[in-house]
Amino acid sequence: LGANEQHYEIVAGSPSIFTPVVTSNSAYMPSNASSSWISLPSGLSSATYQTTFDLTGFDVSSASLDLKIAVDNTMTDVLINGASTGFSIAIGYPAFQSWSNLTVSSKFLAGVNTLQFFAVNSGGPGAFRVEASGNAAAVSEPGAGVLFGLGLMGLAMTRKRKA
């Protein structure tokens, strides 16, 4: 607890930009091995949490990202590569006691992708938590089909010579 969080950075906030830290609060659902609550210094009213992931070598048209999100107090939007998902979590008790689910299946880029979470705190403690899982088909190596085809031709020619 209190250590700098390594997966997210704060790219916008009010009154200033801070590094998020791992936190806990007895009112929140407990952290686990998959995720922990991250927070900002007291008095911060809004923040944009950002993380990146790389889809190099994957077919982006097959990509899907499943997110479980919890927040104290409000999530106003989630962006994938600058495009809004239209996702939000209203202020209220359940927002930090249960998960809200979001599936993203478009707007992915070949290479590095950026996820941004817009969180608003209404005073007192504020925190954010996400668990992510995803799927994408691997892109075959360029020319792998040609090499495979040439290999089959070579196998067929070898069999003809032996016959």
PLM region descriptions:
Residues 161-163:
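Short, charged juxtamembrane terminal tails flanking transmembrane helices
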Residues 1-64, 117, 121:
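Extended carbohydrate-recognition surfaces in non-catalytic/accessory domains of CAZymes
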Residues 140-158:
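A short, hydrophobic C-terminal helix/tail in secreted or cell-surface proteins
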Residues 70, 76-136:
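Beta-strand-rich ligand-recognition modules
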Residues 59, 71-72:
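Short loop/turn positions at the edges of beta-strands in beta-sheet-rich folds
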Residues 46-48, 95-97, 140:
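Short, solvent-exposed coil/turn segments
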